[in-house]
Amino acid sequence: MFDTASLKYDANGLIPAIAQDHQSGEVLMMAWMNAEAVRQTLDSGRVTYWSRSRQGFWVKGESSGHVQKLVELRVDCDRDCLLLLVDQTGPACHTNRRSCFYTAIREGQEVVIMAPQNPSA
């Protein structure tokens, strides 16, 4: 059985987790997990993060319906970052965009490269 203690967490007991669409390879978002969030994710198959602002667990899509189902969890070579291959339902970003990475720096200017899926976002 996978031991979450084998991961390298920061001073706050957190590890960065990058969510990526398992089919398209699109990077969706980055959030934080602690050991218990990793355990809950592996046990339930629904991605659970640790919210630094709320200081509590955050099951992705619990309130919005924009669920992330875990397909595979990967650990980087230094064991200090996770890659979550997910099946994403709806937008991943709280701005109703498919990805949280919706701005780019092009020719020295920041530009929005992805519109919200729901214009009322």
UniProtKB/Swiss-Prot annotation:
Gene Ontology terms: cellular component? cytoplasm
Compartments annotated for it: namely: Cytoplasm
Cofactor notes: Binds 1 Mg(2+) ion per subunit.
The set of disulfide-linked cysteines is: none
Q: Which UniProt keywords apply?
A: Amino-acid biosynthesis, Cytoplasm, Histidine biosynthesis, Hydrolase, Magnesium, Metal-binding, Zinc
Pathway, per record: Amino-acid biosynthesis; L-histidine biosynthesis; L-histidine from 5-phospho-alpha-D-ribose 1-diphosphate: step 3/9
An example molecular function term from Gene Ontology annotations: phosphoribosyl-AMP cyclohydrolase activity
Residues binding Zn(2+) = 77, 93, 100
Enzyme Commission designation: 3.5.4.19
GO BP annotations of the record are: L-histidine biosynthetic process
Q: What's the catalysed reaction?
A: 1-(5-phospho-beta-D-ribosyl)-5'-AMP + H2O = 1-(5-phospho-beta-D-ribosyl)-5-[(5-phospho-beta-D-ribosylamino)methylideneamino]imidazole-4-carboxamide
> Family, per the entry?
Belongs to the PRA-CH family.
Q: What does this protein do?
A: Catalyzes the hydrolysis of the adenine ring of phosphoribosyl-AMP.
Q: Which NCBIfam families does the entry link to?
A: PRK00051.1 (NF000768)
This chain belongs to the protein called: Phosphoribosyl-AMP cyclohydrolase
Q: Which organism is it from?
A: Paracoccus denitrificans (strain Pd 1222)
Q: Which gene encodes it?
A: hisI
